[in-house]
Amino acid sequence: MYVYLKRELQAFTKEKYEKAFSSYFFTDSTEEFLLDFAFWLKERGIRNGNKAGLTHKLRLLRAVCRQAEKKEMYGVNMDNFLCLGDDINWPETTSRAVPETVIAKIANVDRTLFTKKEQLHLDLFLFSYYTGGMANVDVCNLTWDLVQEDRIVYERIKFPKTAKPELLSKAKAIMNKYRGQSYGNYVFPVFTHKHTTTSKKTTRVKQISTRLSQTLTKACKMLRIKENITWYSARGSFISKMVDAGNNPYVVAEMAGNSPLTIYKHYYKNTKREEIKRQMEEMF
């Protein structure tokens, strides 16, 4: 992700200022520079009919500067990012969490009705759910050296956060199922010798994520599940289940690689409304 950001900044400084990005220092990350970069991304997004990953790239740049500030590198001024306003903030999102009963149905679906690749998709989704809602890109890039005896410790690719999910027996079983079938030191057979660059790996993750969602749609139709489930649902579902079970939000956040505020704002969803209503009827 950071290599991709570097390429973006190289293209930006060359096009906007006719200068090489290698000639820039942290002192050059002024408000004017940041606003110009944001505007450049917006213009390109308009031309391409998308948002050009505006918020994600601005947040990546801020994360780089924050790490530099922690290391006391000269010229970093985090206050400059305030000029970006809402451009650097994620829009309000709706949690895609589903009840644990829905996840259980998917876990117990008749696998003989799915192809070998579709079974991999189901396993990747369930593994994500069992490991703190691990993001698709992190599941695909997971390597065996990050797996400890009782937990997984990894740096999230999209955000500069460390996640430490407990390693459940169900997650272990899924990993061991694919042991020896993957390229290099990867846990799952997602990448091959052809995926030699960050760009190729990113494309591969997008491709398998789309196909995984299609497999989940197929499973939902077979199981008569009404919810629209995607890979993203695993994260919210794990967090909601753990919080509803009374676990400390800080512990849950550490497993997911988020802050307690973030898990409540973006991922938690009350999936037990009927149960709570029954309890309230008894209480009142």
Language-model features, listed with the residues they occupy:
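Basic, Lys/Arg- and aromatic-enriched nucleic-acid-binding interface segment
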Residues: 55, 78-136, 140
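N-terminal core-binding DNA-recognition domain of tyrosine recombinases/integrases
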Residues: 6-93, 109-113
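DNA breakage-rejoining catalytic core of tyrosine-based enzymes
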Residues: 27, 76, 89-108, 160-168, ...
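Active-site/catalytic core of tyrosine-dependent DNA strand-transfer enzymes
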Residues: 103, 168-226
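Short, basic (Lys/Arg/His-rich) helix/loop patches that form interaction surfaces
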Residues: 114-116, 181-183, 213-254
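Catalytic-site neighborhood detector that most strongly recognizes the C-terminal catalytic loop/helix
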Residues: 97, 156-160, 256-281
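Conserved tyrosine-mediated DNA breakage-rejoining catalytic core shared by Y-recombinases
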Residues: 83, 131, 140-177, 193
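Short, polar N-cap/turn motifs at the start of nucleic acid-interacting alpha helices
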Residues: 145-153, 226-227, 247-266
